[in-house]
A protein has these predicted regions:
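Enzyme catalytic cores with a strong preference for nitrogen-chemistry domains
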Residues: 1-369, 381, 385-394, 426
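ATP/NTP-dependent adenylation/nucleotidyl-transfer catalytic domains that generate, transfer
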Residues: 14-15, 170-172, 227-229, 238-241, ...
Length: 686
């Protein structure tokens, strides 16, 4: 059965809601109505989960009133009412209530779903220090003897070992813990995550003191990252007693260390926050992280004790708008501070890698071909900074611009200007005479004056450039510095062997085109070099990306590039997006297209990098996205892996940015792209 493409639940997402109700202390009848109101709002938003605070049906701050049977009876009656009134709602409701069992009182998280109480989880760790005296009223969950009880008229499992599993969404597995449980060295949710739980929910009260909100964020972020899980957190808010404490109602949703949503603190009334959690991303990361699964094996006897409580989740079919920021440029953060930090790190990783290679070889000179394009510009800048750091003169960089039959005036001028501005040893070698000799040797029609611009015509030029560079390196005892980037490597957009595919060392192989563009803008903005150099860099950024191998017309002067790389292989912005989600997360093509359409379908939606000119803001419809994704899948999986199977050494720069067979990507050179192309055809509407 085909899945509804535009529904978030068809692509491994679930929507989570975290609610902070207004409560009355010791008034469960009032509190259940407020809880129901928020639960209905969560259902209207097509949420799969609605989390509420610790002891939210009774209020947390009852202290010794918890030993009053009238309050405990009223709390159980409120649970009965909530069960009956929530039969038609979409989300699982995670609510807090005091529960009597075996002559003890437990602080519990109750999981309700469409008229059924699925299970009850008691709090494992009771704080009994400073302002907390929970052991005065409650018993720790581990002290319960039985594993089932009858509560609110239903026989249900009881314990800290419950994982709620949706039968029809394999990656949707939920565990609950309560407040202090997260503050311990080994929270119960750690074991639950190892047992397969992907969504960890914390019903918390947690009074507020100065600095505590940031500490909560740190705890939730770290636990979600360590467990490779979503972590939902709801602290008590307005209405709790302020006899000795205050409450800020902090609600948080994290996914693998990333904050997805946070409430307004100290709000006067109730709140609800929502975010969409990517369960498939969590499952992919766990599958890849061998140490996570080693930990599962280490604790397997304990993990086997967990009980699965299965349920059939009713999927909301109207959840079409993704409530999640999907950055257009996944390799380049929108946040200026993070973006600048990433550029700083990428730049210095490149410099550090090249410096080490020069030191280890004892070679103090570099040979580089400078085209006036983005990649060779970035490599030349890295080389210049490397020489500075090593205390070597920039004249040790032997930079050559090698014009051919389609070199434009603008790129040639930029190449010469950049070499002058950086103070490197610069020289121009016209490769046309040697290319013509090659055409004659090949008996190519171009040697007879015929305008035949085929792949041989292009690759003879690329090969001649690289051949010159390697022989120049031999002649001057230097290393050839490679310039090809990650995007080109993914798409196979390089001339194999004696071509731009090969070098002695490559500083760009782990840097995608969109990040190189941002790196150059950062170099300009941070004034890494002088104003003259920055002006040339800006001119290079403004120039059309082109291989410059095919002339426009014989005998016609070329002021600007006439070939457009992106007209052949697709916009680099889209292809870098595809590259990131295919290689970093292993997503199926239909999901990549869904995310791409969310990111690129409307240029007025979402944020753009502040340094990107407004005329560069663009949008793509689903048909265009599908077309170029098909190009990417075919080129990446079927026709270009042989080039990646033998690439020069290069430093890994980003977490999703290496295609080296010695690093992140090991794949056969003779695979077929059929399964990806077929999934794209079936899964994405035309």
């Amino acid at each position: 059965m085909s899945k509804p493409f535009h529904c978030i639940y068809a692509h491994g997402f679930i929507r989570a809601a975290v609610c902070v109700p207004f409560v009355r202390v010791a008034d469960p009848a009032y509190n259940v109505e407020r809880t129901l109101g928020l639960a209905r709002r969560a259902s209207e938003r097509q949420a799969a989960i609605a989390l509420f605070p610790e002891l939210g049906l009774s209020a947390y701050s009852n202290e010794d009133l918890f030993h009053q049977d009238a309050l405990l009876d009223a709390s159980e009656a409120a649970v009965v009412q909530l069960i009956e009134s929530s039969r038609e709602l979409y989300p699982l409701l995670l609510v807090g209530a005091p529960v009597r069992f075996e002559g003890k009182l437990f602080n519990c998280a109750l999981t309700l779903y469409q008229g059924q109480l699925l299970g009850i989880t008691p709090k494992s760790y009771l704080p009994n220090y400073r302002e907390f005296y929970e052991k005065r009223q409650f018993t720790a969950g581990r002290l319960a003897v039985g594993r089932e009880l009858t509560y609110a008229g239903q026989r249900v499992p009881f314990g800290t070992d419950l994982v709620y599993q949706a039968r029809n969404i394999p990656d949707f597995a939920l565990h609950t813990e309560i407040c202090e449980d997260l503050w311990t060295p080994v929270p119960p949710s750690t074991y639950a995550a190892l047992a397969g739980a992907t969504v960890l929910a914390n019903l918390s009260a947690s009074n507020i003191t100065i600095g505590k909100a940031e500490y909560r964020r740190d705890l939730c972020a770290a636990q979600s990252g360590r467990c490779i899980a979503a972590y939902l957190y709801s602290a008590a808010g307005p209405g709790e007693s302020t006899t000795d404490l205050a409450w800020d109602g902090q609600a948080l949703i994290y996914e693998n260390n990333e904050l997805l949503a946070e409430s307004q603190r100290f709000a006067a009334d109730e709140q609800i926050i929502t975010a969409d959690i990517d369960l498939e991303r969590l499952a992919q990361d766990r599958m890849r992280l061998t140490s996570f699964n080693d930990a599962v094996g280490e604790h397997r006897e304990q993990l086997r004790q967990f009980r699965r409580v299965e349920f059939d989740f009713r999927i909301p079919s109207d959840a079409r708008t993704l409530l999640r920021r999907v950055e257009r440029f996944p390799f380049v953060p929108n946040d200026p501070a993070k973006r600048d930090e990433r550029c700083f790190e990428a730049y210095h990783i490149q410099v550090h890698g090249l410096a080490k290679r020069l030191q280890s070889t004892g070679i103090h000179k570099l040979v580089i071909g400078v085209s006036g394009g983005l990649d060779s510009t970035q490599a030349l800048i890295v080389a210049a900074r490397t020489m500075d750091n090593l205390g070597l003169p920039r004249q040790n960089i032997l930079a050559y611009t090698l014009p051919g039959y389609a070199t434009s005036a603008v790129t040639l001028n930029n190449a010469h200007g950049l070499m002058r501005a950086l103070g490197v040893s610069a020289r121009e070698i016209d490769i046309r005479p040697s290319c013509l000799q090659m055409f004659r040797d090949l008996d190519h029609p171009f040697a007879r004056g015929e305008p035949v611009y085929d792949v041989t015509f292009e690759n003879v030029q690329a090969g001649e450039r690289t051949s010159h560079l390697f022989r120049l390196a031999n002649h001057h005892n230097a290393l050839v510095l490679g310039t090809g980037d990650l995007s080109e490597l993914a798409l196979g957009w390089s001339t194999y062997g004696v071509g731009d595919h090969m070098s002695h060392y490559n500083v760009n192989a782990s840097v995608p085109k969109t990040l190189i563009q941002r790196l150059l803008r950062w170099i300009i903005a941070s004034r890494q070099f002088d104003a003259q150099c920055s002006d040339i860099l800006q001119s290079i950024l403004d120039t059309e990306i082109s291989p410059e191998l095919v002339p426009s017309q014989a005998g016609t002067a070329q002021d600007k590039p006439t070939q457009s790389t992106q007209e052949v292989i697709g916009p680099y912005a889209l292809q870098d997006f595809n590259l990131y989600y295919v290689t970093r997360h292993g997503f199926r093509p239909s999901k990549v297209a869904f995310l791409s359409h969310h990111a690129w379908g409307d240029k007025s939606r979402g944020d753009w990098p502040d340094s990107l000119p407004s005329d560069k803001h663009t949008e793509y419809d689903l048909a265009t996205i599908k077309r170029w994704l098909g190009v990417f899948l075919f080129r990446f999986f079927q026709i270009s892996q042989f080039k990646r199977s033998c690439v020069p050494n290069a430093p890994k720069v980003g977490s999703g940015g290496s295609l080296s067979p010695r690093g992140d990507w090991r794949a056969p050179s003779d695979a077929a792209a059929t399964v990806w192309l077929e999934e794209l055809r079936r899964g994405v509407p035309d």
